Amino acid sequence: MIKHLDIVWTNQFKKDYKLAMKRHLDIDLLDDIIRKLACSEQLPEKNKDHALTGNWVGHRECHIQPDWLLFYRIENDLLVLTLPRTGTHSDLFGK
């Protein structure tokens, strides 16, 4: 049985999503990754999914494109996919 996760969009993620659309990024790529995560599917290796450390410990990051990232967290006991941020490396890390 496939478990489907409820998706929680933070207010910051909503702003980041609108910014991605304004930048004319391919939103379908982001939506496809969100769908895969919500359906508990493993992401392809090209997305470089990995755990984060520091201020983002407990979250994961995957690459939508080389300089377009998605931060997310899956809370298994609640079956919730939380989407705190998306953006470029400089948007997210200030570099």
Model-predicted segments: where are they?
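Basic, Lys/Arg-enriched alpha-helical interface segments
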Residues: 1-66, 75-82, 90-95
